[in-house]
Design a protein with these regions (language model features):
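Hydrophobic membrane-insertion alpha-helices, especially the h-region
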Residues: 4-27
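Charged, low-complexity, helix/coiled-coil-prone segments
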Residues: 24-29, 49-61, 206, 217-231
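Membrane/wall-proximal cationic-aromatic binding patches
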Residues: 30-94, 112
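A broadly tuned preference for mixed-charge, low-complexity surface segments
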Residues: 42-49, 114-131, 174-195
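Glycine-centered flexibility motif
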Residues: 71, 103, 216-218
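Membrane-embedded segments
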Residues: 75-164
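Secreted/periplasmic serine-hydrolase-like ester/acetyl group-modifying domain
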Residues: 155-231
């Protein structure tokens, strides 16, 4: 009986284990490719908004200064005066990296920025604030969750210092995503409680897994709308 069960489920277990090992030990450093970085910078997709590795790759390129342009649906409308078009046409010494989607409001931007804080510290960024963000009621949880992922969560948990900003962000996160991963840790932050050593270990493990997963699968996520010409 056990042998038959192993023959059925054993290969699935081994395959799952191999996938986990591949993700955990996949190198998180990648070589720079300016053309691909321009593609990801101009793709203005939900994947480019959420995914870490392509953002970090572009923002750390020593041969081109990418500047984050944060907003919502403004960046989707490409025309002759779009910041990407102007930067390319007039050979400006920078390229915009667009982080915005229709429906992505301030809380999405806050958690998205957690992924790239070391890369943008003491550097420039452009932030376009939409009037639609200022409403009497919070926006729909489904809209928030569309642009939120576990890597943003662990980046936030790893960056937070237990201050009032982290507490407020944790409260809003629980409201928008009541079933968020590592909910117990987020609840502690929302109450202003200090995290234990076990909590920190859990954050580190999940953060490493998410970072490796982003490095592995992120290279396949930006392959669609190529709005830059190779030159």
């Amino acid at each position: 009986m056990l042998k038959r069960l192993w023959l059925i489920f054993g290969p699935i277990f081994i395959a799952g284990l191999l996938i986990l090992l591949l993700i955990f030990f996949y190198p998180s450093t990648t070589s720079h490719n300016l053309t691909e970085e321009k593609y990801s910078a101009a793709s203005v997709s939900a994947e480019s908004f959420k995914e870490r590795s392509q953002k970090v790759r572009a923002l750390t390129d020593p041969n081109m200064r990418f500047i984050p342009f944060l907003g919502s649906s403004e960046w989707i409308r490409f025309d002759s005066v779009h910041p990407a078009v102007l930067a390319e046409k007039y050979h400006r010494p920078y390229r915009p990296y667009f982080l915005g989607q229709a429906g992505a409001a301030s809380l999405n931007q806050y958690f998205g920025l957690q992924q790239i804080l070391p890369e943008i510290e003491n550097k420039q960024a452009v932030f376009v604030i939409s009037p639609q963000w200022f409403t009497e009621t919070d926006y729909e949880p489904a809209a928030f969750q569309r642009f939120f992922n576990s890597d943003q969560l662990t980046a936030f948990l790893g960056n937070q210092s237990g201050d009032i900003a982290a507490k407020h962000a944790a409260i809003r996160l629980l409201k928008q995503n009541p079933n968020v991963a590592l909910k117990g840790i987020v609840q502690k932050l929302s109450k202003g409680e200090e995290l234990s050593d076990v909590d920190q270990v859990a954050i580190d493990i999940f953060a490493r897994f998410n970072e490796k997963q982003s490095a592995l699968f992120g290279q396949f996520s930006i392959r669609g709308q190529l709005k830059y010409k190779e030159h």
